[in-house]
Amino acid sequence: MVLYSMIDYKAVTNELINDDTCAQGSVYATFDQLVSLLGEPFGSSADGKVQAMWQVKFGDGTIATIYDYKEYDTAVEDVTCWSVGGHSERAEGLVEAILSR
């Protein structure tokens, strides 16, 4: 886990920035916690595998995506285990850090 007292980050909602990211791990949070921290989700997937996704860009350039994957039988508001995507495991650590503040 990345332990920083101040982590610079922003949710990106006006453009797609998650090209070539892949699964790096998962985090536990409620939908409401994520909305409170990052705002409304950026979107969903056309194939229905993802109901909600957030994109986060950290100050060091790390990009992370937070999304429910194949939670077909669970309403998005009830999902508590979220996949984290990125280009490295650092993405998961940074997401864990901002969730634990």
PLM region descriptions:
Residues 2-101:
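Residues within mature, well-folded domains
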